[in-house]
A protein has these predicted regions:
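Short, flexible helix-to-coil linker/hinge segments that flank and couple to helix-turn-helix
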Residues: 92-97, 102, 107-158, 162, ...
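Active-site residues of response regulator receiver
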Residues: 9, 55, 84
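Conserved sequence signature across two-component system core domains
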Residues: 8-9, 34, 52
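The feature encodes the CheY-like receiver
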Residues: 14, 54, 59-62
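Short hydrophobic/Thr-rich beta-strand motif most characteristic of the beta2 strand and flanking loop
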Residues: 27-35, 43, 200
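Active-site beta3 strand of CheY-like receiver
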Residues: 47-53
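Acidic catalytic/metal-coordinating carboxylates
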Residues: 36-39, 59-68
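Recognition helix of helix-turn-helix DNA-binding domains
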Residues: 170-205
């Protein structure tokens, strides 16, 4: 299967560099480029890509607005991989809320870019470790929630709630399996059921819900 990609970035040099890297792969094909959010929406409508590489800061409609439009209401759409820099932390949380499936620093090495594209195309979520730390620092500064387990999570069984807590901490299936003394297959099955029950697109949205609800706290 070939992964169809749209590149949305207002800098032509960045788009050209990304295309050169991606088009060298047998399983990835760049089907369109866009210089702003409006052009990205048109390219997605025309080419139906699997993944959109989305810059945040673009003229006219920015990448955050474009992501919200693409994924509004949780409807099916391409997986959005946000390209960001260390100066754009304030946008990351909003992009997570909008439904982006992955976040990658623009200065990441070639191998990390290819891994990220393949990971989100496969239906998984990806968050650069450096960005994870910065997001957790932001959550630390927020006042803790005192609402208890939200109604949305009450649909989960006790075991599913344990697995969800692991997902919300960003732990892998293998790590959750070791924590709960379960098989990887069982954890994978629980994770799929949890995302479906909670109407979440992927694990990144599970992280958002876990921290927003106060079920998981940084360092907890």
């Amino acid at each position: 299967m070939t992964i169809r990609v749209v590149i949305a970035d207002d800098q032509a040099m960045v788009r050209e560099g990304l295309r050169l890297i991606l088009d060298l792969q047998n399983d990835i094909k760049v089907v369109a480029e866009a210089a702003d959010g409006h052009a990205a929406l048109r390219a997605v409508a025309e080419h139906r890509p699997d993944v959109v590489l989305m810059d945040i800061r673009m003229p006219g409609m920015d990448g955050l607005q474009a992501t919200e439009r693409l994924l509004r209401g949780g409807r099916p759409g391409p997986r959005v991989l946000v390209l960001t820099t260390f100066g754009e932390d304030e946008y990351l949380y909003a992009a997570m809320r909008a439904g982006a499936s992955g976040f990658l620093l623009k200065d990441s090495p070639r191998a990390a870019l290819l891994h990220a594209v393949r990971t989100v195309a496969d239906g998984s979520a990806l968050l650069d470790p450096a960005l994870t730390r910065r997001l957790l620092e932001e959550w630390v500064r927020r006042p803790p929630s005192r609402a208890g387990v939200p109604e949305q999570l009450r649909a989960l069984s006790p075991r599913e709630l344990e697995v969800f807590a692991g997902l919300a901490r960003g732990r892998s299936n293998a790590e959750i399996a070791a924590d709960l003394v379960l098989s990887d297959t069982t954890v994978k099955s629980h994770a799929a059921h949890i995302l479906a029950k909670l109407d979440l697109r992927d694990r990144i949205q599970a992280v958002v819900l876990g921290y927003e609800s106060g079920l998981v706290r940084p360092g907890g």
